Amino acid sequence: MLPRADLLQGAEYRETLARVLDLGEQALKTWQVVWSDFLSPPEIAEVQARLRNLTELQVGAWGGYPQAERQRLALARSEVGLDVRDPKPDPEGIPLAAIQIQGNFLFDPATHRDFLGALLGAGIAREKVGDILVLGDSGAQAIVVPEMVDYLALNLTQVRTVPVKVSRILLSQLNIQPPRVKSITSVEASLRLDAVASAGFGISRSKMVEEIQRGEVRVNWKPITQASYTVGPQDWIAIRGRGRLQIEEVAETK
């Protein structure tokens, strides 16, 4: 049995962690790989951090492509081979499915929120949906649990005012945009969030403070509303609508 009380103590995502612990105990009893629903980045970060030191249980995560934000967790006994970092484009045994949502959105453009709303409106729960990739005028692609593909093909027929057709595609057919890498060197007097983020995103510090105070800024997937919050090497900073950056290293000047 897992030390549930200790693992749950002080957890921010207590309900999510409790469900994952249930799955972990199931994996220990059955000697099978057990998969969670899709989790958000902060949920994944907390679960992995709290389960990291368990010698009897191993945890992996996969969302359909390397940069996926929403992912499913795989749990298995430490004696069971578990590697979700399969290099094949469509690894077998990983319960993820990709769908194409095709329509003509030239005169009624749809956003990520529109496609998510249409999926939820069709009757699918949020935790059954992974990342959604908007393709402009032609529609979108989404990653979902495999058991919902046929249901969505029948029940998702419209996004905004646009009729759509849903079909299954291979994970290797996802239109993944490779992450854009740009090196930025900046000399800052401190590692305050507002100072580092304003330099990284190329906007004024006062504007960055406003973004932070509005809750638009996340550090390592957690919303931060204090401009004076201290960041460090390897931290991710994301701003809604602007993208994300990672602090590669911090060098002291003399």
Question: Which residue ranges define each predicted feature?
Answer:
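Ferredoxin-like alpha/beta domains used as RNA- or RNAP-binding modules
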Residues: M1-G200, P223, W236, G243-K254
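Accessory, usually C-terminal, subdomains that scaffold auxiliary metal cofactors
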Residues: S204-K254
